[in-house]
Amino acid sequence: MSGHNKWSTIKHKKGAADAKRGKIFTKLIKEITVAAKLGGGDPDGNPRLRTAIDKAKGENMPKDNIERAIKKGTGGMDGVVYEETTYEGYGPGGAAVLVEVMTDNRNRTVSDVRSIFTKCNGNMGEAGCVSWMFDKKGLIVFPKSVDFDKLFEAAIEAGAEDVSDEDEQIEVTTDPSNFMEVRDALEKAGFKPDSAEVTMIPQTMVKLEGKQAENMLKLMDRMEDNDDVQNVYSNFDISEEEMDKMM
């Protein structure tokens, strides 16, 4: 399984997605609001906003919530100014971790993130210490039921970099600059994606087992539980057998 999707698969198996829907909504509303403030309220002319709205719809967020978040962004944010930044560090076993945050209090957030690293047998590093281990890419995911050959042909023609047949899904990878263009072309060709986003894909993986694997999952869980954290990326790999032991 490709590394960038490992955590989402594990969360699904743990049944964590539904339990954390409230937090997911909070993070998505913040992303929609900031995207609308920075790039305007028209998703057709604001790729970041359109991606955020699509994610929200994928999580079954009510339309009213989405519209309120856009209005909040375009009409001012009631004095709240969010700062976007990325923290980097190492998890158990030396796995690289990138933490994207959106915060109105940087001192609070950096303290929280550092504490989570420490409590889960990891350590926070300097800017740039692990970001070079990841590539920023557009990732469009399709169900296995899609005709691979037809999707491959359409994706390459639309400008995609790669199409891979993974264990549980088909993944189309693009350069971030033409991500929306490729996605739109594939949708027009009749291919409906399960998800589409610009993400960070690890170049190599770090295999974890035993206590290191347990602590790594705790670290990911606690990072995502923090209201200021928008996204967490890592290059850890945990085998199916190891996951079964922990479930």
UniProtKB/Swiss-Prot annotation:
Keywords (A to Z) from UniProt: Cytoplasm, DNA-binding, Transcription, Transcription regulation
Listed under GO cellular component are:
cytosol
Q: Name one GO biological process term.
A: regulation of DNA-templated transcription
Signal sequence region: none
Q: Which domain of life is it from?
A: Bacteria
What InterPro entries is this protein classified in?
Answer: Integrase-like_N (IPR017856), TACO1_YebC-like_2nd/3rd_dom (IPR048300), TACO1_YebC_N (IPR049083), Transcrip_reg_TACO1-like (IPR002876), Transcrip_reg_TACO1-like_dom3 (IPR026564), YebC-like (IPR029072)
What Pfam families does the record point to?
Answer: TACO1_YebC_N, Transcrip_reg
Has keyword Chaperone? no
Cite a single GO MF annotation: DNA binding
* Localization per Swiss-Prot or TrEMBL: Cytoplasm
Q: Which family does it belong to?
A: Belongs to the TACO1 family.
Q: Which NCBIfam families match?
A: PRK00110.1, PRK12378.1, YebC/PmpR family DNA-binding transcriptional regulator
Return the HAMAP family for the record.
Transcrip_reg_TACO1
Task: Write the protein's name.
Answer: Probable transcriptional regulatory protein Geob_2326
